[in-house]
Amino acid sequence: MTWKKQMALLAKPYYWVNILLAISYLLAKKTQFICTRLFILAGEDEACDLDSREVEILFFLLIVVMIRSRKTGSVTMINYLASSFLYTKVANAILWAYADFRYGLGFLLLCVLVGMVLPEPSYRGPEHITYFRNAQVFEEELARDKRTSWLICFYTVWNPSCVNFAPVFAELSAEYNTDHLKFGKIDIGRFPDVAQKYRISDSSFSRQLPTVILFQQGKETDRRPCVDSKGKLQKFFFSSDNVRATFGLNQLYKEAIERLPIAPKEAKKVQ
């Protein structure tokens, strides 16, 4: 996702409202006008300074956000923000409650209201993805036309990494889909037998979600993430550039175009 697209997404109310909530306590503390009216301590100068406990909470929040963002496979600024909102709001609720229990309760109610009114925006761009609703149909489609290459994303609806990868996969499908290069998705949470067949763990601690497998002539030829020679799972960042390069989408697209039948007018010219 380009910076231009990310900045356009940031203009949506969901993001800037949640950013304000994420920095609300720090903003209130450092804005003199707000601080002197909300926080009543021994002196006005002390009221607007963060004490040691507040600093500890903020540093702990920073560490948690960094760790969780890496675990969820965040590869863009939007992904980092979306994955950090929950933790920043929890930390702010603790900080507001630490200052005054009523402030903490009011902040929680505000977060609930924002969550109801402003849900996270989903990808609404073009896509050419086949969603397999049946394991048998999935296997039949792979074997139906051996000339067609399939790039299949195995996912679950609840996994944050799968959610982050969804718009990336959709954009790639819109760019590279042809009659002989197709993109598909199958929810292994609904079809555990498929997960078992392709050796993909769908547990809540799984590091294999999402898994993307390239099928050529009905057989698996490559996958990410994969295991090394020692049987250790190699971490893979599902960015658009990484997926293009790893699976050679440009070359696959070129080969798929060459397999297309020649149009009648073009055939006459060749003759």
UniProtKB/Swiss-Prot annotation:
The keyword Membrane applies. It is found in: Membrane. Keywords: Membrane, Signal, Transmembrane, Transmembrane helix. It is a single-pass type I membrane protein. Its main location: membrane. A motif (Di-lysine motif) lies at residues 268-271. Residues 124-271 are cytoplasmic. PROSITE patterns: THIOREDOXIN_2. Residues 29-102 are extracellular. One of its GO terms (cellular component) is mitochondrion. It holds the Pfam family Thioredoxin. The keyword Transmembrane helix applies. Residues 1-28 form the signal peptide. The thioredoxin domain lacks the 2 redox-active cysteines, suggesting that it lacks thioredoxin activity. This is Thioredoxin-related transmembrane protein 2 homolog. It comes from Drosophila melanogaster (Fruit fly).
